[in-house]
A protein has these predicted regions:
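Modules that initiate DNA replication and primer synthesis
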Residues: 4-128, 178, 193-195, 503-511, ...
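Extended, Lys/Arg-rich, non-catalytic nucleic-acid recognition/anchoring regions
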Residues: 1-7, 333-336
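ASCE RecA-like P-loop NTPase motor cores
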Residues: 125-613
């Protein structure tokens, strides 16, 4: 039987050792190594042997080992044994012993977070993905998982109290199936279901109708935009962009008195029917956020499908350039608006994260076009100044902000595969949420992940044609490939994957680690009341996530990092989730250096020769 501590004859020795002497300074992160280095106790032979197999991989490591034994003669007094250890170390070096696993000899291995051995724990190499020892996920049967999801939603439905009941469940775990069944079971209750997209709205509406549920879906102008006269659609879009949606329907009514536009006539008729409707309603996140308390109080239960923070709050940004803001200050007759702009401009001389008082803008109904969404600007407290000196694509400084989102309802239930308890607590308030993570089941299909390259936008820019090469390698067509929109491949890309079932049960290729601009993470953080150094930039960090220790470009600040990783993971999980691996024996090939749950890491993938597939 082969000794796993010894390299085979075919494995090459190196002139230089794998680790430089500087690593010795970090070895004290290991509790057992501290015992050895500080002479706090006598180590057993097995403990010393384990440490030695790690130290021989380090320049001057052998010398360090012997120096420490000689430094503590009261613990290691036997000169003969010291001579034996010198011989042992020489033999181990000559035979290229591997660093021994912590689990085999360390008495502390169950109480610390460690990787395979001391070296991989304290010094994670770039492009490596070190599995954290002892990390495991508990899986249940599909039936247990589905039952748990239904029970969680049912409990939240019956619960009393003004709270956000947040239920995290895997993609494909039966979230929509569960709440539709609940709608059928409690047919006397009025449910308001909000989903991310019109596409998903139609799908949920159809499923509910097939079960005989009394339900309507909110009409959408976006869904009929191709049939609306271009000049009218352009005017409608501008009203929304200006933050004046309340002008849209009076404008449509006025246009319908001038000429007959069938699609708009039908849209307005559906709106009128909806007003008088007393059954269940399926709508979108955006529509939900526009509903006032009086309208929301008509419903017995509000269920939000998917993470509304990620999909519809943080993604709903506004911005205005400094020059446009100065022009607005000169033109406005509203003293409160003028004062707010003045404070913002003054603070921007020394700050990037700026807080100014919010107020509700009095719209006089003037039909003149506005330069941007003034109502949202007035209601916003936190702004982030994007400086053109720090961003290549900016021609001048710009104030960015998240458009305020209101949740005036009595109780909300959110079901999502990507919701994060800590982030929900920051946004809604820790005392205002009730968070439950459902049981998980193992994938029926397979998620293969290739993590040697970051596959960020800049990585793909430096490796032109990479996505096309990978498509050829795995025999993927554009429809089965998800990557950045800029690549121009297929109908799905990062940012628009939710709610699509076109790839269910199919082998797919996902390429990319979807970073956003740094300002967005900071903007999200200040909007949640998080304090941080606004000058901090992303840098290479060693992090632990999803059972792996690896190097990743992110923030040092823990809260900023949390938001950053949550957004990346949410986007990747949505993309991978299109194949519905939980219920289908298909394969997803993921090229990203961010590890996902249940991923099988494929090492040493050769991008030139196809080795490793």
């Amino acid at each position: 039987t082969r000794n796993s501590s010894v390299k085979t004859p075919g494995e090459k020795s190196k002139n230089h050792k794998d680790f430089r002497a500087g690593v010795l300074q970090d070895m004290n992160k290991c509790k057992l190594f501290q015992d050895f280095a500080n002479g706090s106790r006598k180590l057993s032979h097995d403990e010393l042997f384990g440490i030695a197999t790690n130290l021989i991989q380090v320049e001057t490591g052998t010398k360090y080992f012997m120096e420490k034994r000689l430094e503590y003669p009261n613990i290691y007094p036997d000169d003969a044994k010291n001579e034996k250890w010198e011989a042992h170390l020489s033999y181990m070096e000559q035979n290229n012993y591997y660093p021994q696993s912590c689990d085999k000899y360390c008495p502390y291995h169950e109480e610390c977070t460690h990787c395979k051995n001391i070296l991989s724990t304290i010094h994670t190499k770039r492009r490596s993905m070190e599995k954290i020892a002892g990390y495991h996920e508990t899986f249940y049967s599909m039936e247990e998982m589905q039952e748990d999801v239904y029970d969680a939603i049912s409990r939240a439905f019956r619960a009393r109290g003004k709270k956000f009941y947040i239920i995290k469940a895997m993609t494909g775990a039966g979230k929509s199936h569960s709440y539709i069944n609940l709608m059928q079971e409690y047919s006397d209750s009025r449910f308001l279901i909000a989903v991310p997209t019109n596409l998903l709205k139609g799908e949920i509406f159809k499923k509910a109708k097939e079960l005989g549920i009394e339900v309507m879906k909110t009409p959408s102008l976006e869904a009929i935009k191709d049939r609306i006269p271009p000049d009218i659609w352009k005017r409608i879009q501008r009203m929304y962009q200006e933050g004046r949606p309340y002008l849209v329907h009076p404008y449509i009514q006025k246009e319908l008195t001038k000429k007959e536009i069938p699609c708009l006539r039908k849209y307005m008729e559906k709106r009128e029917r909806l007003k008088a409707w007393d059954g269940c309603v399926i709508t979108t996140h955006r529509y939900l956020l526009s509903m006032d308390q009086e309208r929301l109080d008509e419903f017995d239960s509000i269920i939000i499908d998917e993470d509304i923070l990620f999909k519809s709050v943080i993604s709903n940004q506004g911005e205005i350039s400094v020059s446009d803001l100065k022009k607005l200050k000169k033109k406005t007759t509203d003293p409160r608006l003028s004062k707010k702009i003045k404070k913002l401009l003054k603070a921007s001389e020394t700050q990037s994260c700026i807080k100014v008082e919010a107020f509700e803008w009095d719209d006089d109904g003037d039909k003149k076009s506005m330069p941007f969404d003034i109502p949202s600007f007035c209601l916003t407290e936190w702004f982030y100044l994007r400086r053109c000196e720090n961003e290549e694509n900016l021609v001048e400084d710009v104030f960015a902000f998240l458009k305020p989102a209101d949740f005036p309802g009595e109780k909300y239930i959110m079901v999502s595969a990507t919701a994060d308890e800590e982030i929900c607590g920051w946004y809604f308030g820790e005392d205002n949420i009730d968070f439950y993570e459902c049981k998980k089941a193992e994938y029926m299909g397979e998620l293969k992940q290739y993590c040697e390259k970051s596959m960020s936008r800049s990585c793909l820019n430096n490796n032109k044609g990479m996505v096309g090469k990978l498509m050829n390698r795995f025999g993927m067509c554009p429809n089965n490939t998800i990557t950045f929109m800029k690549e121009g491949i297929g109908p799905l890309h990062f940012g628009n994957t939710e709610g699509s079932n076109m790839l269910e049960g199919k082998d797919i290729l996902v390429v990319g680690t979807p970073y956003h601009a740094e300002f967005l993470y900071k903007l999200a953080a200040i909007s949640m009341g998080i304090e941080f150094d606004e000058e901090e930039k992303m840098s290479l960090q060693t992090i632990d996530h999803n059972g792996y220790r690896f190097q990743f470009t992110t923030f040092q600040n823990k809260e900023l990092r949390k938001i950053h990783l949550w957004m990346i993971e949410s986007e990747l999980e949505q993309a991978v989730g299109r194949a519905r691996l939980l219920r289908n024996a298909c394969t997803v090939h993921l090229f990203s250096n961010f590890p996902l749950h249940q991923a099988k890491m494929i090492p040493n993938f050769n991008f030139e020769e196809g080795h490793g597939m």
